[in-house]
Each structure stands twice: as C-alpha cells, then as structure tokens.
Amino acid sequence: MNKIYNIVWNESSGMWVVTSELTRKGGQRHRKIKRTMLAGLIAGLMLPTVPALAQVFNDEILDYSSSMSLSAGDSAFNTTIDGGEQYVSSGGSAISTTINDGAQIIFNGGTASTTTINGGYQDISSGGSVTNTLISGGDQYISDGGSATNTVIDGGTQYISSGGNAIETTIENGFQEVSNGGSATSTVINAGFQYISSGGSATSTIINAGFQDVSSGGSATSTTINGGFQLISSGGSAVDTTIQGGIQEVGEGGRASGTTINNSGIQFISSGGSATATTINSGGWQEISSGGSATETAINGGIQWIYDGGSASDSTINSGYQVISSGGSVTSTTIYRGGEQSIHNAGLATGTIISGGEQLVSSGGSAVDTTIEGGLQTILNGGNVSGTLISGGVQRVSSGGSAVDTTVEEGLQTVLNGGNVSGTLISGGEQNISSGGSAVDTTVEEGLQTVLNGGNVSGTLISGGEQNISSGGSAVDTTVEEGLQTVLNGGNVSGTLISGGEQNISSGGSAVDTTVEEGLQTVLNGGNVSGTLISGGEQNISSGGSAVDTTVEEGLQTVLNGGNVSGTLISGGEQNISSGGSAVDTTIEVGLQTVFDGGSVNGTIIDGGEQHISSGGSAINTTLDGYQVISSGGSVTTTTIYHGGEQSITNAGLATGSIIRGGEQRVSSGGSAVDTTIEGGLQTVFGGGSVS
C-alpha cells in the first residue's frame, strides 16, 4: 500500500473510502478529517498486506483529494500538503514537509523532521516522533506516546496531551497547551504563551518574554523566568522556579514551592494562592496579599511584602526586609543579623524571633509574642507590641510607641521620647526609662529599672531587683518587697510602699508619701523625703539627708551624722537622734524619742510618749505631757511640763529653764535643774540631785 491515495465520498455507501490515484471522487469534498474518523482510517491502513518494497517520494503535492501513507522504510522528501493528508507509521519517515492546509499524521514509530506548518495540523501519537518542526500558523497535536523535539512555534499552536511529550520547544509568537497527562520539557518562551492544565506538566521551561499559565491540576517544574510572566492558579503548581527578571503570580488556589527570586524578579501571591520554601535573593521581591500565603521563605537580601489579608509563616530573614502592612500578617519569622522586619499600618507579626536583626513596629503596626535573642525591636509612632521576651537583645520604645507585657530575662528595654510600656517583667535584665518615656506596672524580680531625664514610672513592684531614679526621673506607687529603690541626682518618687526591701534617697533625690511596712528607708547626702509612714520598718536619715512629716506608727526613725528631720509624728514606734542628727517639731503620741551622742531636737511635743536625752544629746523647747528622761550627760532647755507630764533628771543629766505647768520635775542622783519655773505642779529633788 506504499503509494499515493485519494479519499473520495461514496454516494451509495454514504461514507469516505480510500481509492487509488486513478479513481475520481464524486460528491462532497472535505477540508480536514475529523480526529474521531481518523482513528478508523488509520486502522484500515494498518491491515495486513502483501509486503512491498520501500518507496521514496520527492516533491509531492497533496491537495484536498489526495493522501500519502508511509511505512516500513518509506520516505518522503519536500512534500507539500495543500489540503490532503500524509500518514507516517511503522518506520516510515517524512522529511522537509510543508503543511499549508490538511494534515500530517505520525504514529506507530513513524517519524517526521524539518516540518513547516503554515496551516492545517500535524498529529503525533502512538510512538510517532517529530523533530525540527516550525509552526507558523497551524496546529501540532502530540498524544498517546508521541513526541516532538526542537519545535519552533511562531504563530501557531502546539497541543500536548494524554502521554504526549514535547522537548526543547521554542515559542516565538504562538501557543503551547499541555494537558491531560501531556508533558513539555525544556520549552523556551520568547514571546508566546504556554498553558499547562488538567494533569499536564512542564519541566525546565525558560520564559524570556512570554507567558506561562499553570492551572487546574497542571504543574511546572524548574522553570526559569528571565523577563516574562508565570501564572499559577486554580489548582496549578510550580516547583523550583527561578525568577531572574520576570514575574511569577500565584493566585486562586495555585501553589508554588522552592521558588528562587533573584535580582529584579517578582513573585505575587494572592487570592488563596500559596508559596512554600521561597528564596528571595538581593534585588528580588515577594508580594503577598488578598488571602495569599507564603511558608518557609528565606530572605537573603530581597524584600517580602505582606498586606491586605496576605500571610506568611516561618520566614527566615538573613538579610533584606520583610514588610507587613494594611492587614497583612506573619507568624514565626526569624530575623538574623542584617535582616529587618517592618510592621506598620495595621500589619501584624506573631511569634517573631530576633536573633541579631531588627524588628521595626510603627504607625499602627503590632507585634505579638516576639523573642529577642540578640538584636533590636524598635516601637515608635503608634506601633504597639505585646508579650515580647528579651533574652539578650534590646527593645526600644519611643515617639508614641507602646509595649505591653514584656519579659526582660537578659538584655535591655529602653523607653524614651513619649514611648510607653506596661506590665513589664524584669527577671535579669534592665529597663531604662528616660526623656519622656513612661512605664506602668513593671515587676522587677531580678535586674534593674532605671528612670532618668524626664522618664516616669508608676506601679512598679520590686521583688528582688533594683529601681534607680535620677536626673529628673520619677516613680509613683512603687512597691519594694525585696530589693532596692535608689533615688538620687534630682530623681523623685511618691507613694512608695516598702514591705521588705530598701529605699535609698541621696544626692538631691526626693521621696514623697513613702510607706515603710517592713524594710528600710535611707536618706543621705542631700536626699530628702516627706510624708513617710513607718508602720513596721526603719527610716535612716544621715549625712545631710532630711525627712519632713514622717509618721512612725511602729518601727524606727534613726537620725544621725548630719541628718535632719522635722514634723515627725511618733504614734507607736521610736525616733533615734544621734551623732549630729537633728529633729524639729516631733510629736510623740505613743512611743519613744531617744537623743544621744550629739543628737539634738527642738520643739518636741510629748503627748503620751517618752523622750530620752543622754550622752551628749540635747533637747530644746520640748512640750511635755508624757515622760522626759535626761541622763548621762544629756541636756534639755526650756521644757514645758503640763499636767500629766513628768521630767526626770538623773545621772549627770541637766535641765535648764524648765517650766512646770501642772506636771512634775524629778531631780535625782547627780541630775541637776537650773532656772526652773514652777507655775503649777511639783518639783521633787532626791538625794544627790541639785537645783538652782
């Protein structure tokens, strides 16, 4: 059967039949055989025949009424198909065929090379193969084990399906469709279109300036985008894409994994699209929005931007930027040295780990549960963070930024220039509040809170660490359970509760309305306090320190070494004045004032309590309605003793100018009283006592 055939319409049988070239057709002429009819025709041509010698055809023209069949060593050169059909199978070959209209069918081991398709189509199936095809206006179909190599599409279409395979296709200005189990390998798209869907696959495609569309179950592997566009959507997937200078868009259920974005490359992820294990190198860009998501992205100098409902998780920033804004969100980002995460305008970052890089939160952005191992978290201009753990780096809050529930294990929280924080726990590091910064409800378990230069704090709990207030810093309502509050150099505090620790006021520091339940308040070197309530602990005033309006309910006020106090009320505790200390206008309702070793008091009112003056201590202008004891070198001047009061002078004690107005003065055993005035009451002088 190796010859030229005609296909004609048989009027009587109502079907197409194959005849020899001498048979003339009658009836209707066809333009192109339908592929459903083609299968039966091919089967007919494959019926067993008597073996024939291989034939060679040159320069044949197949018009609408003719066809050619090549098999078993047959070959045709320079055939032109102008409406007819050429069948190549079983070892037949067609070389340098031109298809203007009609069809070339290659199957069952047939081959074709250097075909030009201007119109019509070429069909390769069932083990057929073609090489070096140029499609400039027609179609090429590859299926069922057929293959095409080195095809150039410059205006036509290549269809690959059902096990067909196209290798090294170049699309200059046309269309390649891969579907239903078809595959394309090493395609180069310069200006055309590649469409992969429904189980089709493309491997090692290079997109220079054209378009690759992967959807509906199609897949693309190892694509390189130099300047064109790759779209993955509707169940399509792309693996190991390299974007050099073009665009990959992943949307509407598309999936991309292992993408590498190099300089000038862009990846867009939106509308339910997802990307996994993307690498963004220097100059690359990944943009995620509108329900798109990215997982396990590595940023090595490029930019990842998440906004408008986009999300990213498990990103690693080695260098470069991650930007979250306008409703975008990220989780579990790790930032290394040289990397930066920027969150603003309603962006949200959760679970970020800063390990040498920086997280910047501003302008309505927020970060939750950040861990700072080393590096910097900066919050400013309306940014806010919560649940940050600082275990080695720095959190900087300024210019309207806010931080809530930060834990400082090791490292530094700095608050300044209008920044504010609340609920910070310091368990080993430092909190520094300055220049208009503020902190509320800080807990210092171990470590340091420093407040200076206009910084202010309130509600701090010190349960083991230290609070240092200086240089215009202020603290309100601090509780010192265990640890130290230090106030100096112009620092000031108010409402401090000391229930086990210590408050140290010096060098121009001041404290107002401190309550000492248990522990110590120390005031020295120019420090000053007022309104202190001692209800169980101790207040120690020395070396130029001063205290005003202290109330001692239970506990001790000690004044020595140049310390001075005024307006103290003792209603159950003790005031101890010695070694150059002084007290003015003390009122003793219940309790004891002891003055010795060079201590001095003035204007004390004893209204039920006791005053003991000894060993070089002195008291002036005391009002006595209780008990005053002067002994062992102590001296008093101008004590007024009212009814119910008693002044006892003994053992080298001296009282001068006492006025007895209803009470009693008792002088005994080496005591002496000079210039006493008895207006009413009793002066009793015992053996060894002297009055004059």
What do these predicted ranges mean?
Residues 8-53:
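Gram-negative bacterial Sec-dependent N-terminal signal peptides
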Residues 1-6:
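Short acidic, Pro/Gly- and aromatic-enriched capping/linker segments at domain boundaries
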Residues 85, 89-100, 105-266, 270-303, ...:
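Thr-biased low-complexity repeat/linker tracts and other Thr-enriched repetitive architectures
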